[in-house]
Amino acid sequence: MIISSQLARMSLAGVCLGLSLAANARSQPEQASADIRRTSFGVPHIRAENERGLGFGIGYAYAQDNLCLLANEIATVNGQRSRFFGPDQFTVEERENRVSDLFFTWLNTPQAVDAFWQAQTPEVRQLMEGYVAGYNRFLGERRVQGLPQQCQGDWVRDITAMDLVKLTRRLLVEGGVGQFAEALAGATPPAAVAGSGGKQAAFRVADVRMQRFALDRGSNAVAVGSERSFNGRGMLLANPHFPWVGGMRFYQMHLTIPGKLDVMGAALPGLPMINIGFNQHLAWTHTVDSSKHFTLYRLQLDPKDPTRYLLDGKSLPMHKQTLTVDLKQPDGSVKSVSHVVYSSQFGPIVQWPGKLDWDNQYAYSLRDANLDNDRVLQQWYAMNRAGSLKEFQASVHEIQGIPWVNTLAADDQGQTLYMNLSVVPNVSREKLAQCSDPRIGLQMIVLDGSNSACAWDIDPQAAQKGIYAADKLPQLLRKDFVQHSNDSAWLANPAQPLTGFSPLISQDSQPLGLRARFALDRLGKLAKSGPIAAADLQHMVMDDQVYQAAQVMPDLLQFCAADLGADAQALAPLCASLKAWDGKANLDSGVGFVHFQNVMEPLEQLPDIWRVAFDPLDPQHTPRGLAIERAPVAQALRQAMLASAEQVKASGLRKDTRWGDVQVVSSGGEQTPIHGGPGTLGVYNAIQSVPRTDGKREVVSGTSYLQVVTFDEKGPQAKGLLALSLSSDPASKYARDQTLAFSQKQLSVLPFTEQQIKSDPDYQAQTIREQDTKLAVQ
């Protein structure tokens, strides 16, 4: 009995110890592990048993390829650039560090960041926590080896989940208040002295940046359904045009949790899920939409105090928020400075000299709908996991987390889907008419801030207060095709126009962009030649056709053939190069393409240059033709040609210069020629490049992640590439390899199945575990 009692006590103690250990284990984060298998071009295929493990693998792999990039962006979204790099240096977006820091200190307050974090699902939190652990794990390993040259400094540190929240919040406001950083940082009452944010040069750059937003973050998309595809199943062309550098640089990867998730595509920095991609049953992409995601409010100020405003006749004080930013001094010391941001109940006061002035009568407040969007990560993860197009569409309806893009998709059953279901302020056409000045136009929506009736309407069916519910937004489900190239929702498919929406959502009967006209023209021609194949979608991008050339080249050549008088000799080389040009933006296209760009850019700024004006009844073919018979048009054309001739000569370009000699990208320590050109000229393969001092042009954005996905009885069959390559580290072997493939127009199979992955000639596998000090490499 004594022995039995002792055994019983020992057993009970063992049970208690076991329960204690189990409880302690539950209170601790589960130790994560992941397999990282890399295939050609270093594309990581990350597999784990749960979200934390998957995030761990994503963060580790991303750090292997872009350690310094993410560290730099973390410093940015924490408002610490001035502290580490100095207040007068500039971000990659050409924004002064001091202004950037003030903006992100305002945007990412501890309260806002914590509220976003608390709103996340357990799965999303686990992904983010795993990502942090994976990134920090690789950072620790790399510190032992020595950090890359481009990120030597105390600004490189372990990250936290809150850092990823801040990155996400920056992404959310890219289509809204993020474009007003200078205006927010520079807003001061009329009696005060304007600070650094009021510099005119900074606002000129900001104005250009705002105008370029849709160009630098544009996109093309085509989804083909069973009625038009070669095999009766769905097909998708995804061609997002995004920056090649900085915090909006896509990263390619494949994510798997057996039995739960299997998705491949591309994601933006710091995001532990796919933004654009495909899974077993469907493929999807996004295009930047034309919807409005913020409104301005013109405040009527209290005559006694410009920091008070009148609402329904009552004087209300503006809220004052004091921000503190650390500035690195020339001697290396750090000085803290304070700045006050003013806000009304609608949002922060923004001051843009000559546009949005803060005087003694009026001030302007900005309300961004995406500041309250804490659903974006849940949204993309639900889309990643969708097992059907119906489930995919339902997730967007229910969550409403898409910030400022359209969504196009195709599935293995031959259905196609277009959704303009982003976060849009609920301002009806009627309210807009009552609450805005029609003379201002619709480029920026300015509502009456003195009348509470002009507040955004509330729909109980919407996911957040003040936005449109999903069933009030444009969407189209078809079996022939849907397409989009950053225009409104109107002609996603001309056979079924989408009309009658608030101007904040979509405007119809407006001129189409030239990329959309090209797409509809090409799809129309393909319809006459038979079913559409994957190669047809690839050629839409890789043909590098300059669609506008077909609209105006006969007129340009006719002008050249006329008597040019005293300018004949000066314009002879230009006219000869235009005549010899092939009408494309290929590497071997002649210098005529340079002249064409130089001539058309100033002409397009003028009114009434077209022989056939825009006709809303024929939007696919109008406007067209240069009205060279009109003296003002002929004079403007002559001046543009003379200017181009002089510019090309000064740049050192010769008659035998090719486009590939001009447009290049510097990566991996080398320069790579890049085909493609301005989307404003109708180049579907839209590439944005900026002039350099040596006469060349450096690529900054454009075709980034490119995928063409079809389906058969086995699942998705995909080809694609990441034009900017996987790694931003110039020392990496993955810094330039896909860029060369893009230059040569060589898309590769995207390995999705286990057989495809393991049979890849460059296959390598790595297993990582949180507790390991050594990694298993096979």
Each language-model region and where it sits:
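Hydrophobic alpha-helical segments
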Residues: F294, I402-L526, N598-P602
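Second-shell loop/turn segments in exported
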Residues: G57-I58, L102-F103, P110-Q126, S365-R367, ...
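Substrate-recognition/specificity elements adjacent to catalytic centers across diverse enzyme folds
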Residues: Q28-G247, L255-K260, M264-M273, F278, ...
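Glycine- and hydrophobic-rich flexible loops that cap the catalytic core of alpha/beta enzyme folds
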Residues: I257, V263-L268, G277-Q280, H286-Q443
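Bacterial N-terminal signal peptides that target proteins for export
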Residues: M1-S11
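A terminal-accessory region detector
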Residues: Y418, V427-A433, D567-Q663, G669
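N-terminal signal peptide c-region/cleavage motif recognized by signal peptidases
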Residues: S20-A23
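Terminal end segments
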Residues: N493-D567, L571, D661-Q778
